[in-house]
Regions:
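Flexible loop/turn segments at secondary-structure boundaries
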Residues: 1, 14-16, 27-28, 40-41, ...
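Beta-propeller domains
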Residues: 1-44, 52-56
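Boundary/junction segments of secreted and surface-exposed precursor proteins
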Residues: 209-212
């Protein structure tokens, strides 16, 4: 397969879709993508951390929302790609993100390919000439919170329904709030607590060639 993403939404799936609170990492494909012919619109991605993929976030279409994502170390493609072509991303809002490479092109710089739509309150390594990992607590050990001296702190802007409950004078840039919850993606509840001692996991079905 020559194309793909860990989370892939085609045109008809994008309106009203919300991709949030994920760690996406370690693949030769994209992290999360609104894909297709450019007719997709009104998708939302927020509070995702993406690293060690081949292109972090890619968005085609228009009137999407990209808020409070953190992305770095994603090969020779950019960390957040808001495509200038294939829909043009008119009306797309890119805000409160923190990434080493945010651009309107798969691999070209922000200076050569400015992000289309509305672009503000982002930390972009193309603009700062710094590494976003230097402003995170311990990214090598999966602690992506801003460290106490990080310039990400209070550098964002409030977004209703996304940054509610922020700490300080303004929301932080990126997927984590300094002093806020150290969230970890995935199921954290206990099966026994929810279903009781009688719960048993279903046995896999094997038909001689495939597990179902």
């Amino acid at each position: 397969q020559s194309d793909g993403a860990l989370i892939q939404c085609m045109v008809g799936q994008q309106p009203g879709t919300e991709i949030r609170y994920n760690w996406l990492h370690d693949t030769i494909k994209y992290g999360a993508r609104f894909d297709g012919n450019g007719a997709g619109n009104n998708g939302l991605m927020h509070h995702n951390v993406i690293w060690n993929v081949q292109g972090g976030i890619m968005v085609k279409g228009f009137e999407h929302n990209l808020f409070n994502n953190t992305s770095f170390d994603n090969g020779d493609k950019n960390d957040i790609i808001v495509m200038i072509d294939q829909g043009g991303n008119d009306g797309t809002i890119t805000r409160n993100n923190a990434a080493n490479k945010i651009s309107g092109h798969r691999s070209g710089s922000y200076q050569d390919y400015p992000v289309p739509g509305i672009y503000d309150h982002n930390w972009n390594g193309y603009e700062t000439n710094q590494n976003i990992k230097d402003f995170l607590m311990d990214p090598e050990n999966y602690d992506f919170r801003p460290h106490p001296e990080s310039e990400l702190i209070d550098a964002g802007t409030n977004i209703a329904g996304v940054t509610d409950g922020f700490i300080g004078s303004a929301p932080d840039q990126g997927a984590y709030e300094y002093g806020g919850e150290m969230w970890v993606p995935g199921i954290s509840w206990d099966l026994v607590e929810v279903f009781g001692e009688d719960f048993s996991e279903p046995e896999p079905m094997y038909d001689g060639s495939l597990f179902h």
